[in-house]
Amino acid sequence: MNSNKAMMARRSDAVPRGVGQIHPIFAERAENCRVWDVEGREYLDFAGGIAVLNTGHLHPQVVAAVEDQLKKLSHTCFQVLAYEPYLALCEKMNQKVPGD
């Protein structure tokens, strides 16, 4: 079993000093608004990380959409190689936001 203390030691040896870390805790898994560390302790996720603030961790609709997309294309930079879902999202956002 990993411990937060042991992982902090590994981090100290492996991660550049310029990469900050607020809490000496390492996440093992998350669901909805809860996160469990590598020692099994449960926390409420008050950090609201990218892609989970509105839906929580592992929202079933988000998981399904990601799985569907990964079967087609995992990632590309739209400015280099464009793809249709990006256009569809922009069109949808433009319909909801006022202005020209």
Question: Which role fits each region the language model picked out?
Answer:
Residues M1-E31, Y86:
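Active-site-adjacent loop/helix segments that line or gate small-molecule/cofactor pockets in enzymes
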Residues K5, A9, C33, R41-L44, ...:
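Short amphipathic alpha-helical segments
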Residues Q21, V38-G40, Q69:
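Hydrophobic alpha-helical segments with strong N-terminal bias
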Residues I25-A47:
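Active-site and channel-lining beta-strand-loop segments
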